[in-house]
Amino acid sequence: MLDHVTPFFALFACILVLFALGWHIRSRNVGTITLSLYLFFGNLDNFVNSVAWWSTAEDKAPGFCEVSIRLRHALYIAIPASNLVIARKLESIASTRQVRASASEHKKSIIIDLLISVGLPVLYVSLMIVNQTNRYGIIEQVGCWPFLSLSWVWVLLVAAPVLIVSFASAVYSVLAFRWFWIRRRQFQAVLASSASTLNKARYIRLLVLTAIDMLLFFPIYVGSVSDTIRGAITTSYVSWSYVHTGFSYIPQFSAEVMEMQPSFKARLILSRLVCPISAYIFFAMFGLGQEARQGYKHAVLKALVFCKLRKERQKPIQNHIVANIEVVTFQSRETSGGIDGSPHSEKFSINTPTKYEEA
């Protein structure tokens, strides 16, 4: 039997990962925004699948499964693609290749980031049908699961893109760290010259995030698919019709059947843990900073006021300052009354208008 703790572990991670999303949206950091959303939907899907198929393998939600398996498949490359966008940005800033850009250049940069972090997963999912042997399958305690034919085409369209994107992200991460280390003494000036919304502390947190992806998740993925690649790369792709024979059939597996396949069970458990662990790391990087804590405090105070458990703080009333201003007027030396003209003052509070007498 698979564990019953992971689904709730995923639900809590799903909530935590949204805490720092507001700051990422304000900073317009495409990589961290898409990574937050992917981790949110990945953990939510994990929780819903596990709860809906807690003790059954019945085909009871075909529409949901169609969406769920595509989301699961997309996440294989979506998370590394978002990390690649983050690593590219960090390397560009630290190498001083990113300077104050015009509006058109900034727009172009955002489009490129979106093509990598969103366009690439969409293309990846659209090619899923080439190797898809069934609409989906159902595994008790796991939920909907994609079933793919293993061949050299699977290596080309499924395994290789993830490895390439992950490797590119690792290269950019190393380069970003190298430039950061070279320019560490004047790095605040480097950030200022790049017109970046990042400060040094946030830059370091992003750098640590990409390093964790490079040192932890990339080796795990390589290790989990290496044996499969060795077996699949020598297997021919017979034909489209052969692969899709019986496409509408929905295979259903009980938890007891999974117990008899330890290698597949290990991959299942690993796949269920990647999103929650990634979300907790993401929260540790961005959900515990000073700006995040201030945001939590503000949100809690707002909630207490809304629930009428705390009075809303009144803004201090500004006291009006009464100024005793004098207006100086001048009289001519030769006046009809023979009065020796000399400057005299009138109180500002007197409503008599100031006049200049004719000479």
Swiss-Prot record:
GO terms of molecular function: mating-type a-factor pheromone receptor activity
Ion transport listed as a keyword: no
Protein family according to the UniProt entry: Belongs to the G-protein coupled receptor 4 family.
Sequence intervals crossing the membrane: 5-25, 33-53, 71-87, 110-130, 147-167, 206-226, 268-288
Region annotation (Disordered) ranges: 335-359
Localization: Membrane
Protein name: Pheromone receptor 1
Function: Receptor for the A2 pheromone, a prenylated mating factor.
Biased amino acid composition, Polar residues: 348-359
Lineage of origin: Eukaryota, Fungi, Dikarya, Basidiomycota, Ustilaginomycotina
GO biological process: pheromone-dependent signal transduction involved in conjugation with cellular fusion
Organism of this sequence: Ustilago hordei
GO cellular component: plasma membrane
Topological type in the membrane: Multi-pass membrane protein
Domain of life of the native organism: Eukaryota
Record key words, sorted: G-protein coupled receptor, Membrane, Pheromone response, Receptor, Transducer, Transmembrane, Transmembrane helix
